[in-house]
UniProtKB/Swiss-Prot annotation:
Belongs to the COMM domain-containing protein 7 family. InterPro entries: COMM, COMMD4/6/7/8, COMMD7. GO terms for cellular component: cytoplasmic vesicle. The keyword Transcription applies. This is COMM domain-containing protein 7. Keywords: Cytoplasmic vesicle, Transcription, Transcription regulation, Ubl conjugation pathway. Signal peptide: none annotated. It is found in: Cytoplasmic vesicle. Widely expressed with highest expression in lung. The gene is COMMD7. The lineage of its organism: Eukaryota, Metazoa, Chordata, Craniata, Vertebrata. It comes from Homo sapiens. It holds the Pfam family COMM_HN. Component of the commander complex consisting of the CCC subcomplex and the retriever subcomplex. Component of the CCC (COMMD/CCDC22/CCDC93) subcomplex consisting of COMMD1, COMMD2, COMMD3, COMMD4, COMMD5, COMMD6, COMMD7, COMMD8, COMMD9, COMMD10, CCDC22 and CCDC93; within the complex forms a heterodimer with COMMD9. Interacts with RELA. Interacts with CCDC22, CCDC93, SCNN1B, CUL7. Its main location: cytoplasm.
Length: 200
């Protein structure tokens, strides 16, 4: 197997077999499954709806739900990696072909990827920003009055208190910085703000 764009990790053994099963699906079946998959990728919180759609697809196409879940897990390998690495539709297509999916189906999936890429990118950025949402920040300046290291006496330091939202809870994070570290941190925060304004 060739090198993949979406991951450097070894690919699970089941993936090759799952791709062969996907190749056996008719064009209409593959199209319907891809539609279900992109609904899930663009609205990942709708897990129950996704599982219900998979169950319905399995029943309609007389495929066991267990094998369909394995197929979908293998199929999600590329888009999940592609989101993390911002891959192009061509790279997504190449990865599916490398994994053993037929060129026709890989092309169809990559076209769908191209159509949904802006929505998926916005969602991925939103997820990244929601991991630890900064709610509030306070800082206090201080001067070192006593230290075992003579040159540190009289140096200015800064204590930061960050209020971070983790899930449904808030947590206080305390950081102590030297003045140069603080200015570097401030500079990075300005860069983040500028980047964020580009997306709004």
């Amino acid at each position: 197997m060739g090198r993949l764009h979406c991951t450097e990790d070894p690919v699970p053994e089941a993936v090759g077999g799952d791709m062969q099963q996907l190749n056996q699906l008719g064009a209409q079946q593959f199209s319907a499954l891809t539609e279900v998959l992109f609904h899930f990728l663009t609205e990942p919180k709708e897990v129950e709806r996704f599982l219900a759609q998979l169950s319905e697809f399995a029943t309609t196409n007389q495929i066991s739900l267990g094998s369909l879940r394995s197929i979908v897990k293998s199929l999600l390998l590329v888009p999940n990696g592609a989101l993390k690495k911002s891959l192009t539709a061509k790279q997504v297509q190449a990865d599916f072909i490398t994994l053993g999916l037929s060129e026709e189906k890989a092309t169809y999936f990559s076209e769908k990827w191209k159509q949904n890429a802006p929505t998926l990118a916005r969602w991925a950025i939103g997820q990244t920003l929601m991991i630890n949402q900064l709610i509030d920040m306070e800082w206090k300046f201080g001067v070192t009055s006593g230290s075992s290291e003579l040159e540190k006496v009289g140096s200015i330091f800064l204590q930061l208190k960050l209020v971070v939202k983790k899930g449904n809870q808030t947590e206080n994070v305390y950081i102590e910085l030297t003045l140069p570290q603080f200015y570097s941190f401030l500079h990075e925060m300005e860069r983040v703000r500028t980047s964020m304004e580009c997306f709004c």
